[in-house]
């Protein structure tokens, strides 16, 4: 009977040890440790910190210098940060590392036990560095928050990213978009130049400046065969961008983004309305003084009917009429003390100045033209010529100036009506040539600058921006890359 109990006990102990080995192996796999011979000898939890003790079984070592057998000089425990399983806890690996010494008294060579998952003298596993780098893809994450997440210093997180990540320029596609983004890092980096692949939306590159002394050596360094393959260059109405076609892309045609053309006339109308607001505010101020009022720093002059309507409802003039939701039901206006609907506000604006209706109607003609001829540049050319003739003879100086603008950029505007096929999440679709995608990309650059509360290192900003906004960034992990040489030249 006793023999049976001993056998059963031995079986239970053996089964328990087998389970523990399997359990330890699963934990090491879960921790993603590269050294398969490592075992977990202990686990403890102290507050919000988990401690896992790792060690290897002793094995025979021979001196790499003389070939004599080496003896262990004992164990040294290293604290290693390994940011896996961070479910509200900090995870610390207690790594028991042996030190070996050659038994030959004439040699005395010593070495420390090495591990593949952590480098010598490092307090973080190799996986930590890769996870830190991956965290920089989130534009909403600051370097400080990333460092806090992985229990490292801000400096370590930034140095790790800069050490491993070097982003090269992407190849040019046959449709390229260019635009500037305001960074204002220093006297050399005020407006950076964003270059984008129109098909994929990925940023091709980010240049420190849009000035000639930056762009000229940069584009000249790109092989001519690659630049000759560009068919369309999309930009706003900034003349140096349009001149890129003749200087750098000999086979391309310039495309002026339709959004910027519409923004030009909207800005002019808005400035006209603001001038009206200033006029009525000045009138109200003079009436207040003439009626015995005293002007000081505490004086508040209530907004007149004209100022109120022009300030709060000028969007009825500026917004595309097709996108305005007109409501017929009357609602009490607390400032005017009357029941009003959208049509009433519109009529009230036109009664203040009938020119506002003329401006709105002339603006709507261009909005409708811009929306109706996508994919049909030939008919767009005919309609644009008719619009130019209408604006030139309308008697309104704002639209006469607009007609001059349309004449100056006539062919570039027509090119924006070309449609091309793009691949999206839902499959293939037709898209009009526009700078819309690059405007969205610029907002990400501005958000990154704001989140970092200002940047002073352009190379780090460039690398972070490209790494975070490309779909599948390829890390060029080399110490240096070939920078662009900038020359002291003024813009043309």
Description of each model-found segment:
Residues 2-110, 114-115:
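Short, conserved DNA-binding cores of transcription-related domains
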Residues 2-13, 81-187, 227-228:
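Short, positively charged, Gly/Tyr-enriched micro-motifs
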Residues 3, 9, 159-232, 237-244:
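RNase H-like nuclease fold core
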Residues 4-7, 56, 60, 71, ...:
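Acidic/histidine-rich catalytic cores and adjacent linkers
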Residues 52, 63, 102, 146, ...:
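Short, conserved catalytic/metal-binding motifs centered on acidic residues
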Residues 151-154, 236-241, 260:
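Gly/Ser/Thr-rich loops at beta-strand to alpha-helix junctions
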Residues 190-193, 266-278:
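Short, surface-exposed amphipathic charged segments that create phosphate/polyanion-binding patches used
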Residues 251-267:
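Inter-helix linker motif
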């Amino acid at each position: 009977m006793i023999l049976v109990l001993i056998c059963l006990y031995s079986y239970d102990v053996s089964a328990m040890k087998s389970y523990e080995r399997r359990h330890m192996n699963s934990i090491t796999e879960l921790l993603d440790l590269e050294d398969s011979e490592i075992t977990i000898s202990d686990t403890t939890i102290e507050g919000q910190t988990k401690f896992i003790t790792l060690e290897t079984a002793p094995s025979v070592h021979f001196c790499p210098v003389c070939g004599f057998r080496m003896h262990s000089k004992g164990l040294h425990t290293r604290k290693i940060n390994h940011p896996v399983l961070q479910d509200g806890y900090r995870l610390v690996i207690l790594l028991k590392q042996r030190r070996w010494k050659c038994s030959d008294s004439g040699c005395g060579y010593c070495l420390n036990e090495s591990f593949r998952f952590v480098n010598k003298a490092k307090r973080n596993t190799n996986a930590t560095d890769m996870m830190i780098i991956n965290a920089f893809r989130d534009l909403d994450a600051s370097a400080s928050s990333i460092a806090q997440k992985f229990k490292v210093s801000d400096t370590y997180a930034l140095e790790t990213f800069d050490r491993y990540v070097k982003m090269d320029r992407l190849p040019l596609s046959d449709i390229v978009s260019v635009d500037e983004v305001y960074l204002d890092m220093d006297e050399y980096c005020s407006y950076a130049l964003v270059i984008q692949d129109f098909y994929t939306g990925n940023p091709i590159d980010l240049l420190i400046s849009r000035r000639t002394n930056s762009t000229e050596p940069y584009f000249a360094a790109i092989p001519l065969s690659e630049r000759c393959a560009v068919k369309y260059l999309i930009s706003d109405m900034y003349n140096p961008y349009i001149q890129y076609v003749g200087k750098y892309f000999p086979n391309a045609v310039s495309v002026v983004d339709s959004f910027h053309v519409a923004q030009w006339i909207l800005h002019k109308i808005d400035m006209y309305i603001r001038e009206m607001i200033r006029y009525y505010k000045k009138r109200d101020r003079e009436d207040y003084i003439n009626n015995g009022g005293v002007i000081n720093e505490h004086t508040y002059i209530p907004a007149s009917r004209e100022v109120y309507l022009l300030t709060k409802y000028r969007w009825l003039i500026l917004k595309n009429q097709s996108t305005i939701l007109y409501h017929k039901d009357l609602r009490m206006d607390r400032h005017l003390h009357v029941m009003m609907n959208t049509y009433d506000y519109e009529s009230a604006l036109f009664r203040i100045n009938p020119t506002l209706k003329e401006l709105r109607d002339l603006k709507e003609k261009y909005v409708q033209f811009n929306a109706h001829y996508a994919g049909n540049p030939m008919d767009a050319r005919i309609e644009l010529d008719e619009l130019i003739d209408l604006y030139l003879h309308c008697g309104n100086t704002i639209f006469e100036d607009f007609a001059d603008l349309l004449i100056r950029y006539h062919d570039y505007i027509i090119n924006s009506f070309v449609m091309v096929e793009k691949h999206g999440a839902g499959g293939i679709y037709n898209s009009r040539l526009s700078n819309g995608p690059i405007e969205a990309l610029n907002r990400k650059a501005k958000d990154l600058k704001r989140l970092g509360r200002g940047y002073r290192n352009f190379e780090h900003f460039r690398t972070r921006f490209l790494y975070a906004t490309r779909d599948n960034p390829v890390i060029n992990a080399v110490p240096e890359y070939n920078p662009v040489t900038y020359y002291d030249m003024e813009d043309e």
